[in-house]
Amino acid sequence: MYAQKTTIRAPMGKVAQLRSLIAEKYLPAVSARTGFVAAYLLEQVDDPDACELIQFWDNQTAIENLNRTGVLQASIQTIAADLPGVHIQREGYIIRVAIGNVPELAQTAHT
């Protein structure tokens, strides 16, 4: 399994707009792609403009195929296009150790 962590810094006071873009535009496009497992948007408690978007994929090839499509809706750059001033940094990880399975959270955690 493969995980992608995207660190996102929203412009001051714009995290609600960021959350809406991710929940309504970005994640629906990404979740329809082959190999997608789940995604979680984490909002930092002590810094209201800082977020982490964690995505889980079957393997690294699945996310690389997504990035190669060039489809803007499936690209994290769609957020930058719709929310000027946002800062985005991505990192990828191969998951070597895991315990637990809570897939239902992927359906309900965005509210």
Regions found by a protein language model. Give the residues of each.
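Short, well-ordered beta-strand segments in beta-rich or mixed alpha/beta enzyme
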Residues: 2-8, 38-69
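An amphipathic, aromatic/His-enriched active-site/gating alpha helix that lines ligand/cofactor pockets
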Residues: 24-25, 29-37, 56-91
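Short, surface-exposed ligand-recognition loops at beta-strand->loop->(often short) alpha-helix junctions
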Residues: 9-22
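Short, flexible segments with low predicted structural confidence
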Residues: 1-3, 18, 34-35
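Residue-level signal for secondary-structure boundary sites
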Residues: 14-16, 61-63, 98
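Glycine-rich beta-strand-turn "strand-cap" elements at beta-sheet edges
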Residues: 2, 9, 40-49, 74-111
